[in-house]
Amino acid sequence: MNLKDNINSKISLIIGITFAVFIDLILSKLMANWSYSWLPVQASKAAPYVDNLFAFETGIGTFIFLGCSGVIGWVLLFNRAPKYDESYGEPIEGNVKLEIVWTLVPLFLVIAIAIYSTKVNTTLQNLGEKTKYDSQKELPTYLDNNEASAGRFIDVISRQWSWEFKYPEGFSSSELHIPINEKVYFRLISKDVIHGFYIPAFRLKQDIIPGSIISYSLTPTRKGIYRLRDSMFSGAYFSQNQTNVIVESKDAYQEWINKTVKKVQVDGLNQAGFLYKKRLEKGDKGWATIPPAPPPLVNDPGDPDSPHEG
């Protein structure tokens, strides 16, 4: 091969690689945009930041996957040995340029992901302050120092396997009602084991630790009915430990408070109790499990059959 052919070959290789990288970037961008549709609706101020990070990581993952798959496919298609050729390949080993590339590229990607993730985590922390108290003795001090929010806490009480929400107005509910576009303050409390306070539409997942109180705040931004799930394996019926989260206008929220505070308390929502009763009727067979905690008394048991948006 003469010099001219060698130069043309290198130019063709560079053009081919550039075109392949360009196509990879386009497909990665399309996949990143598509990833938004895989997630539930965005219903809190935190949701867009989490979704953007997810899309960013999806795009990077797609670029790496397609790039590696493309190289493997190219080698399989165009660098195979001729038919019936059983000779050994050339003993090629070591390529400093290639080793530098495959060291620097992952390093750059990891640093980029770390910087972006840290930025998102900082933003989420600013949007929803979170503090863990190891004993209830520390809570009064916090409330004294934060009088503006002291009367706005909604106590989220988790049990095996039911949810209870106690409001500052002195009543409780099995469903969580909150006003749109207003910061809502929670105190997360567990009565038995570790539970997970998980609302996919809010992009919120917080462990609830027994013996501790965790204060948390968020701002819902979209009206609708969403789903609160127990994301921790808290026992046999943890998957049934779900309830609705209702985001409504300020007027509708206040109207619900005025009605609910006058209601007589009844047993709260407890799907696990129903399932455990059926188990006993069948002879209590299968893996051993503890009985569900008695349902809490609430002013509004809610409607478990209401349609929700994830």
Listing of model-derived features with the role each one plays in the protein:
Residues L3-I7, S28-F54, L76-G310:
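Non-transmembrane, membrane-proximal soluble domains of secreted or membrane proteins
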Residues S9-I11:
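Polytopic transmembrane helical bundles with strong interfacial aromatic enrichment
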Residues L13-Y36, F63-G70:
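Alpha-helical transmembrane segments of integral membrane proteins, especially early/N-terminal helices
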Residues L53-G67:
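Alpha-helical transmembrane segments
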Residues C68-F78:
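Central hydrophobic cores of alpha-helical transmembrane segments in multi-pass inner-membrane proteins
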